[in-house]
Amino acid sequence: MTKMDIRGAVDAAVPTNIIAAKAAEVRANKVNWQSYLQGQMISAEDCEFIQRFEMKRSPEEKQEMLQTEGSQCAKTFINLMTHICKEQTVQYILTMVDDMLQENHQRVSIFFDYARCSKNTAWPYFLPMLNRQDPFTVHMAARIIAKLAAWGKELMEGSDLNYYFNWIKTQLSSQKLRGSGVAVETGTVSSSDSSQYVQCVAGCLQLMLRVNEYRFAWVEADGVNCIMGVLSNKCGFQLQYQMIFSIWLLAFSPQMCEHLRRYNIIPVLSDILQESVKEKVTRIILAAFRNFLEKSTERETRQEYALAMIQCKVLKQLENLEQQKYDDEDISEDIKFLLEKLGESVQDLSSFDEYSSELKSGRLEWSPVHKSEKFWRENAVRLNEKNYELLKILTKLLEVSDDPQVLAVAAHDVGEYVRHYPRGKRVIEQLGGKQLVMNHMHHEDQQVRYNALLAVQKLMVHNWEYLGKQLQSEQPQTAAARS
């Protein structure tokens, strides 16, 4: 099992304020174990052990006891969790377990050792707790599961891991719905408390993604789309930081860097960087950018990330950030690294690289390449590369974008492609592009209407010289509107 020594990482296992406050309250309410014994709800053995364990105040005393009675400790805690129904007592037990693990990470082994003796795994003891109603109980169980999974020598796998990751995704998606203004059922939990519980869930994810194997499982579970969904909606800076932290962790794996190319990560992070007022958010975005350029083993992948950053005006942001002073040396080092690498990429940037990067970012604008006759003459056929990858992006933008400038430029580019590539009409029709362009001929924006009309005429007409003369009368209006 591979674990990373993660530079500058905060301890994701630290509880949020609401969990810490509730845990302190729970610790103060001691349990009358004798009454449970008299009611025959627990065994004399478990009652005797838990009372002795509670009396051990110092970490050294606890450690000495656990070294000789680790198996009994795991057995007692699991018996108490499974035989007692009272919520307050279950909370107390989980808090004791969490405190014990936080005090010494190696103590997770007592649960794995006990489970192995019972020919079981540790997960079935804790995963059912995620279905309980009380939010503190649920989130304490989630924290314990993450610690066992991240700190233990045995990986969580198969249906157990899928179940846990699906639970995390559901909790994060509930935050996404709150951010979008959709009503979410939260019971008696206030909005502020709910937000802190979601931060606790994000902390569990941060802990899990420190382990390389879990990164692959998270991506396979469509976890990246979940993260991007949270980032694309309004969320507090702490959750924003935690989600970007998770992306940063994913980008430690070269294979993950390759896989993450298919998501629109760079534009989203560059937007957040532009608006960020928190140094910790700035720091983690720069660290993520650095990982994308540094951990990627394929030159093409590194170049694609660099071009996406250039397209999203990250160079300008870095130049502005360079003028500021930071307490954290990592920020200055990352800024220097990124400026150097992006500067090298700018030198190697061809017009086609520029066009490709702009198109993949989904943020089309009237940059010079779109109007360059030379560009289209030399590069129209290159839009067919990689099974028409760029053309598919172009037609998709015509379908999903609501930005008039993006639609106008996309329609224009479709027209230029069919004008310069002999079989372009057939390709565009097969991709559904012709109908998409025609749909915009009655768009409310004049620029979209004009460029859609022009593209449709290029799809229909064979005599380009005649078409050029026909459109001359409308062209001055367009130029004026564009300026």
From Swiss-Prot:
Widely expressed. It comes from the Eukaryota. Keywords: Cytoplasmic vesicle, Host-virus interaction, Hydrogen ion transport, Ion transport, Membrane, Phosphoprotein, Transport. It is found in: Cytoplasmic vesicle, Clathrin-coated vesicle membrane. One of its GO terms (molecular function) is proton-transporting ATPase activity, rotational mechanism. CDD domains: VATPase_H. The modification Phosphoserine is found at residue 483. GO terms for biological process: endocytosis; endosomal lumen acidification; Golgi lumen acidification; intracellular pH reduction; lysosomal lumen acidification; proton transmembrane transport; regulation of macroautophagy; vacuolar acidification. GO terms for cellular component: clathrin-coated vesicle membrane; cytosol; endosome membrane; extracellular exosome; extrinsic component of synaptic vesicle membrane; Golgi membrane; lysosomal membrane; membrane. InterPro entries: ARM-like, ARM-type_fold, ATPase_V1-cplx_hsu, ATPase_V1-cplx_hsu_C, ATPase_V1-cplx_hsu_C_sf. Disulfide bonds: none annotated. It is a peripheral membrane protein. Subunit of the V1 complex of vacuolar(H+)-ATPase (V-ATPase), a multisubunit enzyme composed of a peripheral complex (V1) that hydrolyzes ATP and a membrane integral complex (V0) that translocates protons. V-ATPase is responsible for acidifying and maintaining the pH of intracellular compartments and in some cell types, is targeted to the plasma membrane, where it is responsible for acidifying the extracellular environment. Subunit H is essential for V-ATPase activity, but not for the assembly of the complex. V-ATPase is a heteromultimeric enzyme made up of two complexes: the ATP-hydrolytic V1 complex and the proton translocation V0 complex. The V1 complex consists of three catalytic AB heterodimers that form a heterohexamer, three peripheral stalks each consisting of EG heterodimers, one central rotor including subunits D and F, and the regulatory subunits C and H. The proton translocation complex V0 consists of the proton transport subunit a, a ring of proteolipid subunits c9c'', rotary subunit d, subunits e and f, and the accessory subunits ATP6AP1/Ac45 and ATP6AP2/PRR. Interacts with AP2M1. Belongs to the V-ATPase H subunit family. This is V-type proton ATPase subunit H. It comes from Homo sapiens (Human). The lineage of its organism: Eukaryota, Metazoa, Chordata, Craniata, Vertebrata.
